[in-house]
Curated annotation (Swiss-Prot):
Recorded metabolic or biological pathway in which this protein acts: Membrane lipid metabolism; glycerophospholipid metabolism
Family the UniProt entry places it in: Belongs to the glycerol-1-phosphate dehydrogenase family.
Identification of the protein by name: Glycerol-1-phosphate dehydrogenase [NAD(P)+]
GO molecular function per UniProt: glycerol-1-phosphate dehydrogenase (NAD+) activity; glycerol-1-phosphate dehydrogenase (NADP+) activity; metal ion binding
Keyword line: Cytoplasm, Lipid biosynthesis, Lipid metabolism, Metal-binding, NAD, NADP, Oxidoreductase, Phospholipid biosynthesis, Phospholipid metabolism, Zinc
Organism: Staphylothermus marinus (strain ATCC 43588 / DSM 3639 / JCM 9404 / F1)
Gene3D superfamilies xrefs: 3.40.50.1970, Dehydroquinate synthase-like - alpha domain
Top-rank EC class of the record's enzyme: oxidoreductase
InterPro entries attached to this UniProt entry: G1P_dehydrogenase_arc, G1PDH, Glycerol_DH
Binding site for Zn(2+): 175, 255, 271
Cofactor: binding details: Binds 1 zinc ion per subunit.
EC number, UniProt record: 1.1.1.261
Length: 355
């Protein structure tokens, strides 16, 4: 029987993907009825401001917008709350997150708290936060995502994103590979715990993973067409979360493992690199032979597949595996409610060649 409860879905109004389009942002805003009667705030970073933020600022000012700029060095909750207060004082209504994950997460949070319009302008394709209604803020009581607002629009300049370090693109692919286990975990929670499961959102998330698997060689070549595939897949994954109303289709046991690593070895590796490594191991736990194929693809792309390559001691990886289930106790996954024993974790890293 169909679930008759009310399920509200908020999707981005527009997704614009092209090359050399940052200076056209005012035109796009105008088409969305976001005229220069609204004050705009650009949330960016010191480096990304010089690369992209400055272009957006000048284009906005040339079109009569009053613009304030925030150059944040981190995405801690204290920084986020400070930006919330300052943007409120300035009467900001259009929040442009220009940069990587930190800038976009801060802009989403500020827009959410101020009931504004959030415009996602990624300069890298390193994870699916560019389109999701969640933000990853450090310093909160839990190392998981915070609900925010769905981006009102996503404006992705492929030319700009192509100039980002290749490692960031690879990280984006790693985040997408994680959907393979995230959806399995969601299905498991549905069967064992009666949790809501949305087939459409699940299939959309899986499609984003399958898309990068299919075109992994093109992506590895650094071709702009490959970059575009990663960007589109990351946006699809973000939209899957919007449809589900949670991060379930995009975040499962592989993300719990990554969050555990964030606690034990902060800043050692990129989010997508950690997620991809977790995906290999979680697929193995499911008895899915696909883990070998995923590992081969990761090697081809240049993603780390061992503890040595990711730069984290194997003892830390084992510890992360044993505490991952505690990160988000209400999120049921293949790790179960009691998690892995240390012995089981060591066996897992040996069997999958992480050690």
């Amino acid at each position: 029987m169909l679930n008759r409860s009310i399920h509200e879905i908020t999707l981005p109004l527009k997704v614009i993907i092209g090359s050399n389009i940052l200076d056209k942002i005012p035109d796009y805003l105008l088409k969305m009825k976001l005229t220069n009667q609204y004050k705009a705030g650009i949330i960016t970073g010191p480096t990304t401001y010089n690369v992209a933020g400055k272009i957006v600022e000048e284009a906005m000012k040339n079109n009569g917008y009053i613009v304030e700029v925030w150059k944040a060095r981190d995405a801690r909750i204290e920084t986020a709350n400070q930006i919330v207060e300052e943007t409120k004082k300035h009467g900001i209504k259009i929040f442009l997150g220009v940069g990587g994950g930190k800038s976009i997460d801060l802009a989403k949070y500020a827009a959410y708290k101020n009931n504004g319009y959030m415009i996602s302008v990624p300069t890298a394709a390193s994870h699916d936060g560019i389109a999701s209604p969640f933000a990853s803020l450090k310093g909160t009581s839990k190392p998981t995502s915070t609900p925010t607002t769905t981006p009102y629009a996503i404006i992705a300049d492929i030319d700009m994103i192509s100039k980002a370090p290749p490692r960031l693109i690879r990280s984006g692919v790693g985040d997408l590979l994680g959907k393979l286990t995230a959806v399995k975990d969601w299905q498991l929670a549905h069967r064992l715990k009666g949790e809501y499961y949305g087939e459409y959102a699940a299939q959309l998330a899986l499609l984003s993973a399958k898309h990068v698997i299919r075109y992994h060689e093109l992506i590895a070549s650094g071709n702009p067409d490959g970059i575009r595939i990663v960007v589109e897949a990351l946006i699809s994954s973000g939209v899957a979360m919007c449809i589900a109303g949670s991060s379930r289709p995009a975040s499962g046991s592989e993300h719990l493992f990554s969050h555990a690593l964030d606690l034990l070895a902060p800043g050692k590796a990129l989010h997508g690199e950690q997620v991809a490594l977790g995906t290999i191991m979680m697929l193995y736990l499911y008895g899915d032979p696909k883990w070998k194929k995923i590992k081969r693809i990761m090697k081809k792309i240049g993603l780390p597949t061992t503890a040595e390559e990711i730069g984290i001691p194997i003892e830390t990886i084992v510890k992360a595996l044993t505490i991952a289930h505690k990160i988000r106790p209400n999120r049921y996954t293949i790790l179960g409610e009691k998690g892995l024993t240390e012995e089981a974790a060591w066996r897992l890293v040996r069997e999958t060649g992480i050690i």
